[in-house]
Amino acid sequence: MKTLLRIDSSARIEGSRSRRLGDALEARWRAGSPDGAVVRRDLAADPVPHIEATTIAGFFTPADQVTDAMRAATVLSDRLIGEVEAADALLITAPMYNFGLPSTLKAWIDHVVRIHRTVAYDGTTFRGLVTGKAAYVALAYGAGSYEPGGTLAPFDYAKPYLTHVLGFIGFRDIEVVGVEGTSGEEGAAAAALDAALKAIENLPSLAA
């Protein structure tokens, strides 16, 4: 059975445009995997704590030297990475907050991007270890003009960061869908959301 791991990060449980796009992407995934299962992790309802010094020490300490405290500090990271490894596809939904991502999503990333677990380093180059999986990203922007060439494009630290960090740990098939102007005039914001949803409807069924 195929599995989709869905990560939601908007602080808004209701009325979130990024979650709405995520619902549509999830529906397209289900069209291609009708018997599949969706594992959900809502970072607003159940925030992931930021990593601490002991967590970082546990990441970089050789296995035979890890202390009980380090082991306890990396239990959550092990669990989150296990969810990614067990899934056939990953769906992340996120709004842009102050040109970047919600801190809850960054905290999740800091637990998941981990040496020897999701990325290898041979002293010269890095190699992602999360391979053979598709990733889907739904982004919502309060303002407009973040498209390539737009006046706010240089301030988009959400899409480039997410695509780079996912690629860094091994994802190669990354589909990004976004909606802009969600904080603008109500009619224009609704039209932008409808256009983004229609674009998702026109996608082929998403691969697991």
Curated annotation (Swiss-Prot):
Pfam families recorded:
Flavodoxin_2 (PF02525)
Give the main EC class: oxidoreductase
Q: Can you tell me which residues bind FMN?
A: 10, 16-18, 96-99
UniProt cofactor note: Binds 1 FMN per subunit.
* Record bears the keyword NAD: yes
Question: What GO annotations for molecular function exist for this entry?
Answer: electron transfer activity; FMN binding; oxidoreductase activity, acting on NAD(P)H as acceptor; oxidoreductase activity, acting on NAD(P)H, quinone or similar compound as acceptor
Q: What is its EC number?
A: 1.6.5.-, 1.7.1.17
Keyword list (alphabetical) reads: Flavoprotein, FMN, NAD, Oxidoreductase
Q: This protein's superkingdom?
A: Bacteria
InterPro entries in the record, alphabetically? Flavodoxin_fold (IPR003680), Flavoprotein-like_sf (IPR029039), FMN-dep_NADH:Q_OxRdtase_AzoR1 (IPR050104), NADH:quinone_OxRdtase_FMN_depd (IPR023048)
Give the Gene3D superfamilies listed for this entry: 3.40.50.360
Q: Reaction catalysed?
A: 2 a quinone + NADH + H(+) = 2 a 1,4-benzosemiquinone + NAD(+); N,N-dimethyl-1,4-phenylenediamine + anthranilate + 2 NAD(+) = 2-(4-dimethylaminophenyl)diazenylbenzoate + 2 NADH + 2 H(+)
The cofactors required by this protein are: FMN
Q: How does it assemble?
A: Homodimer.
Q: What does this protein do?
A: Quinone reductase that provides resistance to thiol-specific stress caused by electrophilic quinones.
- Of which family is this protein a member? Belongs to the azoreductase type 1 family.
Q: What is this protein called?
A: FMN-dependent NADH:quinone oxidoreductase
Q: Which organism is it from?
A: Xanthobacter autotrophicus (strain ATCC BAA-1158 / Py2)
Gene symbol here is azoR
